[in-house]
């Protein structure tokens, strides 16, 4: 099972993690990317994400399929949020289940690392004194 989603509403971490549960698996690993309140000494008010939706979903699915060929994954979910996200809000959640924890850890790391470099999602940091685009993927 592969579950790929990109949406504006809040990510429900418990629901996503529950969706990858499988009683044949001994490990579930999740990465939860949250909005922090400071970057390089500057106070962050919020983040804003924009995406080329159809391409982002396609690239996220490619990442998931690649992970399932590299590791024996039972279930995998990649959810990313767009729009304005407050401090403490979840921007991205990746959850992986596998029979063994090492495979789940490696697959989860691969997914977030690849997502950050290949998926067309752009992040803008909003500070007290201005804003800046901090990443632009191909």
Q: What is the role of each PLM region?
A:
Residues 1-90, 99-109, 113-138:
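N-terminal, polar/charged subdomain of small-to-medium soluble alpha/beta proteins
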Residues 95-97:
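Short hydrophobic/aromatic beta-strand micro-patches
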